UniProtKB/Swiss-Prot annotation:
Gene3D superfamilies: 1.10.287.310. GO terms for biological process: translation. It comes from the Bacteria. Signal peptide: none annotated. One of its GO terms (molecular function) is structural constituent of ribosome. Belongs to the universal ribosomal protein uL29 family. This is Large ribosomal subunit protein uL29. The gene is rpmC. One of its GO terms (cellular component) is ribonucleoprotein complex. Keywords: Ribonucleoprotein, Ribosomal protein. It comes from Christiangramia forsetii (strain DSM 17595 / CGMCC 1.15422 / KT0803) (Gramella forsetii). The lineage of its organism: Bacteria, Pseudomonadati, Bacteroidota, Flavobacteriia, Flavobacteriales.
Length: 63
């Protein structure tokens, strides 16, 4: 998810997407621990999405 897409989301949507992304990251980590992922770069991509969403959510809560 791009930063421009993240900025367009409401706070409720940010929280929902953050939950989904954290779950996806957890699932990917578990799958990678059991057997190597075909595309391990997915881990980095999802982790960065989680960080992007969490940063935007924190920024909005402080305003």
């Amino acid at each position: 998810m791009k930063q421009s897409e993240v900025k367009e989301l409401s706070v409720a949507e940010l929280q929902e997407e953050l939950g989904k992304s954290r779950k996806a990251y957890s699932d990917l980590k578990m799958a990678h621990a059991v057997s190597p992922l075909e595309n391990p770069i997915q881990l980095r991509t999802v982790r960065r999405d989680v960080a992007r969403l969490a940063t935007e959510l924190t920024k909005r809560e402080q305003q």
